[in-house]
Amino acid sequence: MPRSVTADASGSFLTLTFEDGSESRFHAIWLRDNALDPETRSPGNGQRLITIGDIPADTRISTALVDDGALTVTFAPEGKTVTFPGKWLKSNAYDTDQSSEVGRTSPDVETWDSSQPAPAFDWNEVQSDPKAKRDWLDAIARLGFAKLVNGPVREGALIECASMFGFVRETNYGKYFEVRTEVNPTNLAYTGLGLQAHTDNPYRDPVPSLQILYCLENSAEGGDSIVVDGFRAAERLRDEDPEGFALLAGNPARFEYKGSDGVHLRARRPMIELSPDGEMIAIRFNNRSSAPFVDIPFEKMEAYYAAYRRLGEFIDDPEMGVSFKLEPGESFIVDNTRVLHARLGYSGSGSRWLQGCYADKDGLFSTLNVLNAQLGG
């Protein structure tokens, strides 16, 4: 909670001192823009009701006081008085050290290697218990993957899985697709060959940010699923070869898919994507779908390929992958912007039948946020 406040003589900002002794400065224009009163924000949905042009350019702090854990500010020249909860100000403080490491991950993310057990949650518990659902979604948000076990063994059950948190993203493959051996397949995923760890559909813009794979049959020998944390692989490259990391993050790769029925998809994005302030936000890695790299300067191409090769070596490192075999009624979700998935080759004896679909993280995060608010998380 705030303990005291001091407004600068210019009125352009104030300094808030909290009970723990920490201090944060807030600008007048920022406070006015983020006012929580019903004339500025809709009480129903929190959406802003004013534009930046509605706020006077010379907005300044006329008075500021702390009382009962809240900050009350009067703005000139409007003469408008607004109260801000101290907890809200603490959680939204921006007067912090912004000089963070390039290539860092979000504090909400936990990177991992082969020592990470595959988190597993029960289908019925997730459907019936909000806390179990919250824990399931939280694992996907933190780790980038999780299993769901004891589900129904029926076609299309993965659609029910997606509806627990969001919506299926339909593509040219349909609402969902089959993953099993085919004669003359249009995609290598439909063969019995092993697949290198990869992210799906890098040739789409934007890529589907979640993938669900649901097992209906799995009596074939082999065919274990493997997941690899792309963020951890990129961290290893960054620590070993910062210049190589910068090349993969600072130059776009190209990805392409030509399928049947007139489908031709292209995208131009970096293999390692950073936010403007340097946070790692996405990995795209799919050797099968890589198009010729034509956006890297001639003098950097060999170094780019060396970094690409090294990233692939980290991804293929057995110490990086978590493996498991899905049983009928089991499924797993991966964050397709972070976690790569692979498959060991399987024999022609027995049968292996999975169904897959795509979804997006906005629905997952929305459901998780609502559950956290309800459960006090």
Curated annotation (Swiss-Prot):
Its EC number is 1.14.11.72. The keyword Metal-binding applies. InterPro entries: AlphaKG_dependent_hydroxylases (IPR050411), GBBH-like (IPR012775), GBBH-like_N (IPR010376), GBBH-like_N_sf (IPR038492), TauD-like_sf (IPR042098), TauD/TfdA-like (IPR003819). Keywords: Dioxygenase, Iron, Metal-binding, Oxidoreductase. 2-oxoglutarate binds at H198, H341, R343, R352. Coiled coil: none annotated. It is an enzyme of class 1 (oxidoreductase). CDD domains: CAS_like. Fe(2+) binds at H198, D200, H341. Residues 95-119 are annotated as: Disordered. It comes from the Bacteria. GO terms for molecular function: gamma-butyrobetaine dioxygenase activity; iron ion binding. [2-(trimethylamino)ethyl]phosphonate binds at N187, D200, N201, Y203, N286, R288. One of its GO terms (biological process) is carnitine biosynthetic process. Binds 1 Fe(2+) ion per subunit. Gene3D superfamilies: 3.30.2020.30, Clavaminate synthase-like. It catalyses: [2-(trimethylamino)ethyl]phosphonate + 2-oxoglutarate + O2 = [(1R)-1-hydroxy-2-(trimethylamino)ethyl]phosphonate + succinate + CO2. Its cofactor is Fe(2+); L-ascorbate. Contains an N-terminal homodimerization domain, a short linker region and a C-terminal catalytic domain. The N-terminal domain may function in substrate binding by stabilizing the closed conformation. Does not possess the N-terminal Zn(II)-binding cysteine sequence motif found in gamma-butyrobetaine hydroxylases. Homodimer. Involved in the degradation of the naturally occurring organophosphonate 2-(trimethylammonio)ethylphosphonate (TMAEP). Catalyzes the hydroxylation of TMAEP to (R)-1-hydroxy-2-(trimethylammonio)ethylphosphonate (OH-TMAEP). Is highly specific for its N-trimethylated substrate. Cannot use gamma-butyrobetaine as substrate. Belongs to the gamma-BBH/TMLD family. This is [2-(trimethylamino)ethyl]phosphonate dioxygenase. The lineage of its organism: Bacteria, Pseudomonadati, Pseudomonadota, Alphaproteobacteria, Rhodobacterales. The gene is tmpA.
